[in-house]
């Protein structure tokens, strides 16, 4: 991961282009006010912001808070008026934590935590306990191996729970994490940033914005990474370039064009085995006797590569007085390859049929009286095998919305009508079996894998169509807000499996309602809300002759909560209770991780699940110097047998507090100090399913997870100095107290080991 020459050369080339440029505005956000050098008459003009855009500069409760969002209902709404839980991460949070991945910032939002993969791919997170893969960028959701580079992100809007009118439907019923990209603004500015550090650092970024004239603005953001992970020989190399152009036809109409290029390569590190002593009811630890940073994955032949191209269009206009329109489109093209070797799980224990608990060092009769007896150690040699999947998807997405805004002395109405279309094809979805020799974990030596037989070769296509209508009424001087929506969704799935000679297709549809109410007893200080919403996603048919995969996965949520904005708007607090029911939930089939893997790979498993619990969030700016964001979540996310899901921590919390010195303390003027603390509770380390042999119809005994990742609390320190002469230096110390922890896991043989204390330094020059 030391190949930096190309990145440095490209960075220098972009930097040298500065004199040719002249600036833009935040993602799905409005361009900033035009240059002050306009004539005096313009000072009296009113700039009308499209209801489909949000002002990225909004921070009415301090640096860490914005109370406007467009992600929940297609149009801009004050969060105090929303009947669904919505949270915003501002650019100040992203900058203060020097975010290397999106989760570095979103972990301060209630309900969001680490999932089953570590920090080196896919931005996989848990939202209200539901695993969410891939990315939502400017309202469009797509997959990939990459971690989205926060350098191109202006703000993050999180909508909790199912949402009937989002398109395409969210991949997780827990919610949607929408990353709003940086967009052209009508002013001139630029910034160059360089970061160096021990691990997960060594990067450079460039952001140049130019207001060309009253009608045109341009912006280019570029970022280059050459990271070394803490694990031996592992790293990430990434290039992201995002040019954008905005043309303003008038104050009521503008179009923005963007292109995002991403080139990604990361070591496919999957972790180390658990110690054989790990069981359901004790504290798990990494296998003893080996370095915690040991990697048994050779970066030269066990890796993920992903090259993505995104072409985007956003057009907003006022068609007639009170009638607004938004047209947004994306063409997404990606090529992916990821040879993956899975380490076999040792038989170092078994589940007790009478309890379902995994007991290390024991075996049990599967017939009465289900007695146990010791087994010998499984040894320290591990077999492994896997596949080398390739994907070549192409996606076309279109969203078209129309809003009619009406207001008089007694009522304010927002009527929305919208349409959406998504088409995805992947005619390069294939993989071979790959094999590598067994390895002794005490004397590991890299040995290249060899390719075996073809595992699968698929031709996949799917289509999504949506039409929706939504109405929001504000009554009694905005004291009572009612909203309702209905969405009609049509799906078409086609899958041809060349290895098995099977073709399946289905065309389900769904009618999804949503409604809510907001009551504001006292002005804009207290907001009480309730909402109900549904969503659905289509499932890919199975590769077997009998298609047993349900065509749709559906989710329903009831949510209620309260928001308070106090202390002259310096304090914002929210508490919410949610109850989500999901049917036909898809989870990876653990049998695909066996050695050798099934040929072809088995379809996912499906289960129903419920999630219910409480979330608490705080934003505060008690003084002009102090900014705070914090959250705590306590919930249950279980299957029908009341068994927890792999990687889901049912308790989590985080707080970030920043203090900025100014001229009131001359000796420290310009310094900023922040402390971030995040906690994740115990969570299952592997997926458990089914019942034990001792179960009866009246006494079912579910299998329990074989081990749990222990809870952990990490503390991060930030010290920064903002010069009066355009430059900033910042030191981030991650995991200050050097806590040893398990970051995530796939099963007993693949546990991501957490990074120890890590120092990262960032220098930024603004012009």
Locate the predicted segments by residue.
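Gram-negative outer-membrane beta-barrel transporters
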Residues: 476-479, 604-688, 762
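Face-selective signature of the C-terminal outer-membrane beta-barrel domain
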Residues: 311-334, 382-497
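Structural signature of Gram-negative outer-membrane beta-barrels, strongest in the C-terminal barrel
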Residues: 246-250, 393, 410-424, 456-582, ...
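Outer-membrane beta-barrel translocator/receptor signature
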Residues: 152-154, 165-241, 249-253, 571
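Acidic, small-polar-rich N-terminal luminal/periplasmic segments of exported/outer-membrane proteins
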Residues: 50-187, 560
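Membrane-embedded beta-barrel scaffold of Gram-negative outer-membrane proteins
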Residues: 318, 324-330, 334-342, 528, ...
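Acidic/polar loop-and-plug regions of large Gram-negative outer-membrane beta-barrel proteins
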Residues: 225-229, 242-248, 252-318, 324, ...
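C-terminal beta-signal and adjacent terminal beta-strands/loops
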Residues: 678-688, 694, 720-767
